């Protein structure tokens, strides 16, 4: 392939069309069709369980084993469907999706085909730049996950592997697959995809139906991309590629952007775009060819003979609807109005993915501005360095306590950052951190003594301030703060010096 065209050049002649398939692992205690502990649920964790220890005959596809449906997983699926604005089916009907792959022990996957659990939904998404798009949702259906392959090669991929290992702990984990209709967002397509998945993550977290950790595979996104020459009929959808298992918001955006550029380069040079699956290489910033993309008829779907259709009563759906928390979109609108934030301020909170944390910090007693300052600033910075979620570092109550101590004059921003670090690094309470490291502000009498000493020792600077060069007061403030070890309120100290040297 010739040198890849720029993103701007790709958009001159082609209109990108994307479609998204988002797989959400449900955090039920047991798997979808067996009593085995769910590796994505509260009874087990990916880090602590050995391979092939969370399995039953059903997970392994052993002859004679029969599936039974996990009712909690169905309830979670209904709640998620409602939150996506979908209609809910009258019956739960499973189907067999037939294909061969080593991580699929039965040689078929129990999924849904022409009768999904939820259908015809719509989500309003807002990109980081503030553009609003509506993404239509074709369906959301229940299915079981496959096992996990570990290829023993230098790249971790099957190419060049001497052998592969299979872990069936993930086999049978309940999934909801959310499938969008084609999205026409032009140049904003990568950002819309990112915002869509981010909103789904907010929704499943608010519902409590998934751990929603992309880096752990609790949410995985497959991105379909095709390019249509501008001016071509609206009903024409060219060959598409499907980039599989994108597991970070950044990867979703970058992979779609790259695929648009790659396809534009191919078409511009007279080559055809193969309808295939592709894999994203984060380290190289490119997609690599996988296998030819199968159409639905090649999976030979047919009704699951071991599971009869299960009625879904309307009163059950309504009961689930009434038990659901406030929708994240409604929450956003309400909090923005209550906090009196500008569009820019509120988008800063959304882009840092800390809306819930800021809300809980405000409810714990902090001001909206104070809560935002900590969660979008220092805490997000530390979380980014450690590659974890900000919510894993510190509780909203602790942040509110720190902010309250600042307002009372017991801490300043510098000392508060040290308290924050101690709380995060050593799992101390706020008071324990203050006492252990003696981090409260110095009493006013001590500050006054230091101030008198600094003024007497810096008469030249004092005269500059008196003569009107007020910027020189920073030297005096700095000397005081150095002597006090930073344990003073610099802004109050500055005002005190100005009041003393420039009396009205």
Curated annotation (Swiss-Prot):
SMART domains the record matches: GatB_Yqey
Q: Which GO terms describe its biological process?
A: glutaminyl-tRNAGln biosynthesis via transamidation; translation
Q: Does the keyword ATP-binding apply?
A: yes
Q: Does the keyword Cell wall biogenesis/degradation apply?
A: no
**Per UniProt, which keywords does this protein have?**
ATP-binding, Ligase, Nucleotide-binding, Protein biosynthesis
Q: Which PROSITE patterns match?
A: GATB (PS01234)
EC category name = ligase
Q: Which InterPro entries match?
A: Asn/Gln-tRNA_amidoTrfase_suB/E, Asn/Gln-tRNA_Trfase_suB/E_cat, Asn/Gln_amidotransferase, Asn/Gln_tRNA_amidoTrase-B-like, GatB, GatB_Yqey_C_2, Gln-tRNA_amidoTrfase_suB_CS, Gln_synth/guanido_kin_cat_dom
Catalytic reactions on record: L-glutamyl-tRNA(Gln) + L-glutamine + ATP + H2O = L-glutaminyl-tRNA(Gln) + L-glutamate + ADP + phosphate + H(+); L-aspartyl-tRNA(Asn) + L-glutamine + ATP + H2O = L-asparaginyl-tRNA(Asn) + L-glutamate + ADP + phosphate + 2 H(+)
Task: Identify the EC number(s).
Answer: 6.3.5.-
Please give one Pfam family short name: GatB_Yqey
Q: Which GO terms describe its molecular function?
A: asparaginyl-tRNA synthase (glutamine-hydrolyzing) activity; ATP binding; glutaminyl-tRNA synthase (glutamine-hydrolyzing) activity
- What quaternary structure, including any partners, is listed in this protein's UniProt entry? Heterotrimer of A, B and C subunits.
Identify its protein family: Belongs to the GatB/GatE family. GatB subfamily.
Task of the protein:
Allows the formation of correctly charged Asn-tRNA(Asn) or Gln-tRNA(Gln) through the transamidation of misacylated Asp-tRNA(Asn) or Glu-tRNA(Gln) in organisms which lack either or both of asparaginyl-tRNA or glutaminyl-tRNA synthetases. The reaction takes place in the presence of glutamine and ATP through an activated phospho-Asp-tRNA(Asn) or phospho-Glu-tRNA(Gln).
Put simply, this protein is called: Aspartyl/glutamyl-tRNA(Asn/Gln) amidotransferase subunit B
Q: What is the lineage of its organism?
A: Bacteria, Bacillati, Actinomycetota, Actinomycetes, Micrococcales
């Amino acid at each position: 392939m010739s040198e890849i065209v720029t993103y701007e050049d790709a958009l001159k002649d082609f209109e990108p069309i994307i479609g998204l398939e988002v797989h959400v692992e449900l955090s039920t205690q047991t798997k979808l069709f067996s009593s085995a502990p769910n590796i994505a649920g509260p009874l087990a964790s990916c880090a602590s369980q050995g391979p092939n220890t969370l399995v039953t005959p059903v997970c392994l596809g052993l002859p004679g084993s029969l599936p039974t449906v996990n009712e909690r997983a169905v309830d979670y699926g209904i709640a998620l469907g409602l939150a996506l604005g979908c209609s809910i089916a009258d019956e739960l009907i499973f189907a067999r999706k037939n294909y061969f792959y080593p991580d699929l022990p039965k040689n078929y996957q129990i999924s849904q085909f022409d009768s999904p659990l939820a259908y015809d939904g719509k989500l309003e998404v807002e990109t980081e730049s503030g553009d609003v798009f509506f993404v239509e949702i074709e369906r959301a259906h229940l299915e079981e996950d496959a096992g996990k392959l570990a290829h023993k090669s230098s790249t971790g991929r099957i190419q060049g592997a001497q052998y592969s290992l299979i872990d069936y702990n993930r086999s049978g984990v309940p999934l909801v697959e959310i499938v969008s209709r084609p999205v026409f967002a032009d140049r904003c397509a990568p950002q819309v995809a990112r915002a869509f998945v981010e909103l789904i993550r907010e929704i499943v977290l608010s519902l409590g139906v998934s751990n929603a950790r992309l880096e752990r595979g609790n949410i995985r996104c497959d991105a379909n991309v095709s390019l249509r020459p501008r001016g071509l009929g609206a009903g024409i959808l060219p060959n598409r590629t499907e980039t599989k298992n994108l597991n970070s918001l950044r990867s979703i955006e970058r992979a779609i952007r790259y695929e648009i550029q790659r396809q534009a380069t191919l078409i511009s040079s007279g080559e055809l775009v193969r309808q295939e699956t592709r894999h994203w290489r984060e380290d190289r910033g490119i997609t690599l060819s996988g296998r030819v993309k199968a159409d639905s008829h090649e999976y030979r779907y047919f009704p699951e003979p071991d599971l009869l259709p299960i009625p879904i009563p309307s009163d059950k759906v309504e009961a689930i609807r009434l038990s659901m928390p406030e929708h994240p979109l409604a929450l956003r609108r309400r909090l923005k109005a209550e906090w009196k934030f500008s569009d820019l301020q509120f988008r800063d909170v959304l882009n840092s993915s800390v809306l819930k944390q800021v809300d809980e910090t405000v409810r714990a007693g902090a001001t909206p501005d104070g809560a935002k300052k900590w969660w979008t600033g220092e805490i997000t910075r530390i979380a980014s360095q450690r590659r974890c979620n900000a919510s894993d570092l510190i509780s909203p109550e602790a942040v509110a306590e720190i902010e309250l101590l600042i307002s009372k004059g017991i801490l300043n921003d510098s000392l508060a950052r040290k308290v924050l670090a101690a709380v995060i690094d050593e799992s101390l309470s706020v008071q324990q951190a203050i006492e252990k490291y003696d981090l409260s502000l110095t009493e006013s009498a001590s500050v006054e003594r230091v101030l008198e000493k600094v003024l007497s020792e810096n008469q030249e600077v004092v005269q500059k301030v008196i003569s009107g060069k007020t910027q020189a007061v920073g030297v005096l403030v700095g000397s005081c703060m150095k002597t006090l070890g930073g344990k003073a309120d610099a802004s109050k100290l500055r005002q005190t010096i100005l009041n003393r040297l420039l009396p009205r």
